């Protein structure tokens, strides 16, 4: 009986150790709670990579002109993501001074990095817009 308990405890300890050995850090909207950074900015992506994050999550909206832009909120600095053209959205300055990025610009900045990207498509207002966004991605 003691041997069974010892084997069970050993297996439990091994599985707990094994699980913790695979835990990875994902930066939510990049590493943005640091100087010179902002949520979903290219700087936040670069900083997530620089500290060795396994991945960096970011949010994508389909703008009114069917271009994809990177931002978390449905409305940002007075502009609704779905109702505004991408040119108006990319003219918005983030809190760190960067322009709100397009998905293409964001992906280009990510190409040389080791951090994996986790794209969250923000819920479009209609199934048709959702399909368009998915096809563009």
Task: Show which residues each predicted segment covers.
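Phosphate-group recognition and catalysis centered on beta-loop-alpha active-site segments
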Residues: 17-137
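N-terminal secretory signal peptides that target proteins for export/translocation
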Residues: 1-2
